[in-house]
């Protein structure tokens, strides 16, 4: 019985560590983003938006560290990633800026989805994790499409040329 207990204590962390997934370069790039600087001349609203972004970024980094140590699960990372991306988009007021940020996020989602599909096939991640990621990606694509539509509606319609 003691031998079994020792085996669990000694080898279980190793088994957990082996199941930690490799993350795509774009995901790791997001996690290396520095926090936003709070400036004295920030409006109260902008300051709060920056604080929210920084909180989501710090949580993402902390959860990633927990994940690497086997102390949290992939859905927690996907969820905080969604909050981080949402907070980043909300930093921008102009639709063109929002579209640019959403396009960058879509690149991250595409790379992460491809990576996660491989992990599901290898038995290292669940189909449920992949579907959660796909749901978030589809939500982002809807936001991007709506943003692009609002940009095109702001553009003046071309005037017919006089004959």
What is each model feature region?
Residues 32-50, 87-99:
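Short, charge/polar-rich alpha-helical segments
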Residues 152-163:
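Terminal, low-structured helical/coil segments at or just beyond the last alpha-helical repeat
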Residues 45-78, 83-85, 98-141:
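Charged, solvent-exposed structural "stalk/scaffold" segments
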Residues 19-40, 44, 161:
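Short N-terminal segments immediately surrounding and downstream of signal-peptide cleavage
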Residues 1-9:
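Bacterial N-terminal signal peptides
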Residues 85-99, 138-154:
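Amphipathic alpha-helical coiled-coil segments
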Residues 15-17:
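Boundary at the C-terminal end of the N-terminal hydrophobic targeting segment
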């Amino acid at each position: 019985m003691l031998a079994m207990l020792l085996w669990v204590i000694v080898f279980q962390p190793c088994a957990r560590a082996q199941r930690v997934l490799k993350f795509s370069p774009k995901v790791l790039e997001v996690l290396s983003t520095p926090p936003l600087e709070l400036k004295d001349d920030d409006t109260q609203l902008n300051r709060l938006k920056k604080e929210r972004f920084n909180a989501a970024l710090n949580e993402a980094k902390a959860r990633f560290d927990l994940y690497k140590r086997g102390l949290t699960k992939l859905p927690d990372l996907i969820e905080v990633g969604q909050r981080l991306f949402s907070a980043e988009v909300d930093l921008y007021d102009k639709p063109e800026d929002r579209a640019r940020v959403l396009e960058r996020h879509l690149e991250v989602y595409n790379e992460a989805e491809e990576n996660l599909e491989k992990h599901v096939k290898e038995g290292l991640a669940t189909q449920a994790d992949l579907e959660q990621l796909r749901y978030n990606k589809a939500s982002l694509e809807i936001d991007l499409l709506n943003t692009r539509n609002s940009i095109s509606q702001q553009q003046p319609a071309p005037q017919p040329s006089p004959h």
